[in-house]
Structures are given as C-alpha cells and as structure tokens.
Amino acid sequence: MVPPSISVPYVGMEEPAFFVGRKSLSKHKKGEKRKMAKDKKLVKAITSRDEDFAQWYTDVVSEAELMDYSSVKGCMNYLPNGYAIWEMIQADLDRRFKETDVENVSLPLLIPESLLQKEADHIDGFAPEVAWVTHGGMERLQERLCIRPTSETLFCDLWARTVQSYRDLPKVWNQWNSVLRWEKTTRPFLRSREFLWQEGHTIHATHEEAEERTIQMWQVYKDFYEETMAMPFVAGRKAEHEKFAGAEDTYTVEALMHDGKALQAATSHFFGSGFPDAFDIKYVDKNNELQSVHETSWGLSTRSIGGLIMVHGDDDGLVLPPRVAPVECRIIPIAQHKEGVLDRSYELLAELKKAGYRVKIDASEKSPGWKFSEQEILGIPTRIEIGPKDIENNQVVVVRRDNREKIVVSLDDIATQLRVILETIQSDMYNKAKAFLDSHIYEATTLEEMVEKFKSDRGLIKACWCGDEACEDEVKYATGGAATRCLIEDEEMISDKCIYCGKPAKHMVYWGKSY
C-alpha cells in the first residue's frame, strides 16, 4: 500500500505542477521508514506510475537516491547512485567517440560578453537563459562574463588563433563538463539549471566533411541508445525554427516516455561556414588560397538518465538495462547466520568479480525481504539468492529485475550463465520498449482526427505540414501542446495537404507533446 502524499514546499527547486504534492524527501523520515522495515519488507514510498506519472518519477528519483535538491534554486546534487549511472554513460560514449578519432579537451567556464555577441543568432537563442558574472571579488568587471550555456564561441575563438593551414584540420574535439542555463521550470535530470553533458565541436576543410561528421555523430548517439540504454526512438532533422541557434541543420534523437511524451535525447548540429566566419576562422589550402572552415557540434546530457527512468522504470522503482547498470548483480545470502552461507557467498562474489562482473553482496543484518525490495528500487538487473539448501544442491537462484523470473543455476555454471541472463535481459528490455513505441505511433490527415487522437491516446502522430510555423502554433494550441518533433524523410507522405491550413504539404513530421 502506498503511504499518503505529503505536500512539502521546497526552496531548492522551482515548484511546477511536476513537484506539487510530492512526498517529503527528508533523509530523517526516509531513514525512519527503513529502520522500521528492518525486519520486514522495505517500505517503498512510490506512487503508481499509472496513477500519477509525474509523482511516480519524483518518487523513483528520491527512493533510489539518485539526486537531492540543492540550496541553489533549480540545481541538484548528484548522489552516488545517480552519478554512477552517468559514469557508465560517459565510459560507453567516450569509447564510441574515440573510435571515431575524437579527442577530449577542457575549455574555460567563463565567456566574455563581446565573444558571445559575435554570432547574433547564437546569442539571441541563448540570451534569456544566460547567467552573468559581474564582479571579481568586490570589484565590478569592465566586461560581463557569461557562465557557459554551451561552448561554440570558446572553441571558435581558440581555433581563430591557432588554425592557419589545411594541415591543422580537421579538429575533432569533445569536452565533458557542466553548463548553466537559467531555466524557469526545472525537473530532476530532465531540466535543471546546471547539468552535466558532453559537447563535441569540430571544424573541417570542406562542407562535405562537416556534414559527414554531423551524420556520423548522430549515428553514434542512435547506436548508443539502442545498444546500451535499450531505448528505441524516432530520429530525423528538426524543422527550420527548431534548429539549434546558429545551425544550418539539426539532427535529433527523440525517445518516447511511458506517459506518451517525447524526450529530445541527443542532437547533432551542422553549422556550415557561417558560424566560424563570424570568428574569422580561415585556413590556407594546398593551392595557397584562403578558405573558410565548416563546423559541427553535438551533445548528450544527464537528461538521458531521466529518459532511462521513464522508459524502463516500474511501480517498484528503477529498472536498469545491464549494459548501463553500475551494478549488474547483487548477491543476497539467505539464512546467513547458518554455517557456511556467508563463506560461500563471499567465494561466489570473488568468482564473479574475477569473471568481470560488476557485482556486490548485501551481507547486512536486514531481512531478505528488505534486501529484495532495495535491489528492486535501485534497478539492479539481477540478484543471486544463496542459502543452505542451495549450497547443499550446488546451485543458486538468479532473479531477474525486469520480469521477476527466477532461474535456478548450477554454481559450476554461474560465471557463464549469468552473462547469458544479462544479455537476455538487455534484449528483452529493448524489445519491450520498442513494442511500446511502435504501438503508440499513429497517423492523422485532419486536425480533428489529430485532436481526438491526442485526447484518447498517448504517443506520437504522423501528419503532414506546410512548414509554416504559424500553422504549427495553431496545432499546438488545438492539441494542448503537441509540436513537431522531427521530419520524416524516409517514408511516403500520407497526405499532400497540411494538417492545419490545407495548403500543399512540404513535410511529413512526428508530432508530439514533450519534456
């Protein structure tokens, strides 16, 4: 039974509807609950996902101890459980980047105002979200310094001073850092003022090379989400007015959350020569002629963790795909006070670690039921139950987190069979999420049909559009928030008329409400 909600005002974050009525996140109260449950089952203060999706999300983030609120409005503290997931994401992506010859760098946090103003479209796009440093100690600065919302201007300033010849190209760089954007409405992981991310920036000798890199990094993100996060998606180019500030083209990866809303999960941008020309980045080619460079940028942030939670989580907490789980398996001794149980459990721990598994043991004095519940909240993909009878029969019981299936495995085979089980979980989780996505994509050829579909169903709708932003605004108003997510360019259009105005359609697009 879910305990009643308590409405607790909190000054550390904005309080949109997403947070109103959330349960207390007090460590003291949470500790009391768990102390009371020591000899019973761990009390999970998690609202049902279907009852209140926003509250469910907040509860999971809290109960799994992924983050805590900061005393700075709109910012958050990444706790060990949450940061460990980010470290797994970092390690996987960093490997993928380096396989494409990306090099890591680190550029400053602060950007002079004059530098930010060199590219008008770029600064116009970020102006409402910029935070400024105006004083150094007690002295007012002669020029304001922007706390980076993104780093295109810093990279371009550096390259303008260091790139001279075609021999200096390409530059294919990435940095892992945090950025600050003064968001008005904040949600843990999904939208906070300061967040962690990676931002890749490249310059190339030719338009074709830069376009190729843009598409290549877009593909890296798609592979990452499919193979590591077990998250299916739709993907395509953004509409003209949805492109990143200053970009000629933006390619997006859009995942569908369990509540039917889309999440922009990663983007790759092609800038062409316009942005670097504003910074006078030129190089001398093989014919000794001065040429412009062509730029790209691409990024993925900690909102990927929010997407992971909302795609795979259930009413008992997190459900982590094995390839991104910081811990793949937790060993839980049963009747551990009995002779030999703990010794054999620790032997198994050592064996699995030696075999390369990310594995831990819970040998605390809490009851097995409490330990099972905690493992479920944390989303650890498997647990191994081992008790006196198991040892006597030379076996263990492996329990899958995703579907609760119990599998009896010989102790002689556990080091090999556990890998098979984990890979099966990874595959099953992707297939389940893909089936959900596929079953929540609809088609509409009239505005009335689209409005009714959004009233009765959750998901994405394919519909045709003339490309006019005013028409999109009218659709957004009529549907209560649905907007273009990306263009569909690899399928035949389902209509030759715009869903709103009836004029000739230029694009078929995915429409959806979003985070």
Label every model-predicted segment.
Residues 3-4:
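Short, often N-terminal, low-complexity regions
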Residues 8-11, 20, 29:
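Short hydrophobic alpha-helical segments enriched in small aliphatic residues
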Residues 14:
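Short polybasic linear motifs
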Residues 24:
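Glycine- and charge-rich intrinsically disordered segments
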Residues 27-515:
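NTP/phosphate- and nucleic-acid-binding module
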